[in-house]
Regions:
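Cofactor-binding loops of NAD(P)H-dependent oxidoreductases
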Residues: 57
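A hydrophobic C-terminal alpha-helical subdomain
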Residues: 219, 244, 254-304
Length: 304
């Protein structure tokens, strides 16, 4: 019998990548969840991927999630810290805002009789830094959901994918140099030689989730990192110039210059303790995934 996969956040970067990859396999029935399944983003995806069922769901409404998960064998779950309603709740003291949405996904999936959940999670920076940087809320919330799901392993199978450092961030970090009005500066609060497991979210997430679903026994209860390997932060600037021919440079800026203690702690932790805590085992294992992971060079080439 063809298995049904319900995809949370199907119009987002991660969810749409999962939708694309699973649809390409032709092996699954797909149900796409969105707060607005009749919106423009959903319409664009509907035009690309036929045969997908679209349903409304709100991560704050467990009843809507239970309904959306009915009959599904697997749920792909993802939460988003950097959205207006979550940020506002955090500003008003609700530091568990993202965790609560993730918990709702888990609880609703169990109530609907779902067999397994593939959860987009990440390491706890508090744990990686041995308590030095406890305030990276968009890491802590996701990891807390992972711990909650793990504690319920007798009720639902848990699989975990950890995305690397978003290459898309470097687009946001870029500016035209005020010195010559020509050079592209990548202003980042990281040491230029800090090694990052880079990922193109839209291109690399889906193939990894597809791999997890194809290898359920091997991946059960484990972490599968979503990246092809480590690169120095400054490599993104070097690759930009190589691909475009435009002058660029990497500029390390102070941690406190970004106006966010939460992000400042994240960058400090990555400089000191490494993204993924410096783990490298995934590089060899990910060669088994039939996917060419994005590199700094291919990222800029793909952006035209």
């Amino acid at each position: 019998m063809t298995k049904l996969v319900a995809i949370v956040g199907a119009t987002g970067l991660q969810g749409s990548s999962v939708l694309k990859s699973l649809h390409a396999t032709g092996k699954y029935k797909l149900r796409a969840l969105s707060r607005n399944p009749d919106g423009n983003q959903a319409a664009s995806l509907k035009a690309k991927y036929s045969g997908v069922e679209w349903v409304p769901a709100n991560l704050d409404d467990t009843a809507s999630l239970r309904k959306a998960f009915q009959g599904a064998n697997t749920v792909f779950g993802v939460t988003q810290f950097f959205q207006k309603d979550i940020m506002e709740r955090v500003e008003h003291g609700d530091v568990d805002a993202e965790y609560n949405q993730g918990k709702n996904i888990v609880d609703a999936a169990i109530a609907a009789g779902v067999d397994s959940i593939v959860l987009s999670s990440i390491d706890s920076m508090k744990q990686l830094s041995h308590g030095k940087y406890p305030g990276v809320l968009h890491f802590e919330g996701k990891h807390k959901v992972e711990e909650y799901l793990t504690s319920l392993s007798d009720k639902v199978k848990g699989y975990f994918v950890y995305l690397g450092f978003y290459m898309e961030n470097f687009v946001d970090f870029s500016r035209i140099s005020p010195e010559d009005n020509k050079t592209i500066e990548f202003t980042v609060p990281l040491k230029p030689t800090t090694k990052l497991p880079l990922v193109d979210t839209a291109n690399d997430t889906g193939p990894v989730v597809a791999y997890v679903l194809e290898h359920p026994e091997e991946c059960l209860g484990t972490v599968v990192e979503v990246s092809g390997g480590y690169y120095e932060a400054q490599d993104m600037a070097k690759a930009f110039t190589e691909v475009t021919g435009k002058p660029s440079r990497y500029v390390q800026i102070p941690y406190d210059s970004i106006g966010s203690d939460e992000l400042g702690q994240m960058f400090k932790g990555q400089d000191e303790f490494g993204y993924y805590g410096g783990r490298t085992e995934f590089i060899e294992r990910n060669k088994e995934i039939k996917h060419t992971f994005t590199t700094p060079t291919s990222f800029w080439k793909n952006r035209g």
